[in-house]
């Protein structure tokens, strides 16, 4: 009886020891998430100016839509003050909208589009104003947004597309801002 109790205690001790060694190994293996949020941005960068975006597409007004989305994101993010003029800023966000495409995503039984996808490709740069040092940049930042096509109503489809463009610009700004802060 004593031998069975001794074996159980030894087995428990072995499991505990194995668990502690495993925990120690995992904690000490150097595994960690890359990019630490705001720590990637120099503390001296407190104000940001969102420069006018360049629009190389045939879609009128995209530059204003995306610039406004980035301005809203800087205000929502809370990490930076929004500078009213370039000269007042520590850093600048610039954007260059390279392309905007619309493609059919799904079809109705009558072979008409039921849903369409907007795809944008743009260059986004976050740089120090004075030194022009690039803090973060993605030359081919791409994002998609979907919207339903209302059969028989061009006006309803246009409203859906406009709403999808607004959502797409906000999603792009949010994602790019997050990547800027994390250093990815």
Task: Show the residue positions of the predicted features.
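A structural "domain/chain start" motif
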Residues: 27-72, 76-87, 130, 173-174, ...
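Residues embedded in well-ordered secondary-structure elements
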Residues: 18, 39, 84, 111-113
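Surface-exposed short loop/turn segments
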Residues: 77-78, 88-160
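Surface-exposed loop/turn and secondary-structure junction residues enriched for glycine/proline
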Residues: 4, 34-37, 44, 48, ...
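Soluble non-cytosolic domains of exported or imported proteins
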Residues: 56-68, 113, 117, 158-171
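Residues within well-formed alpha-helices
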Residues: 94, 168-171, 175
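Bacterial N-terminal signal peptides
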Residues: 16-28
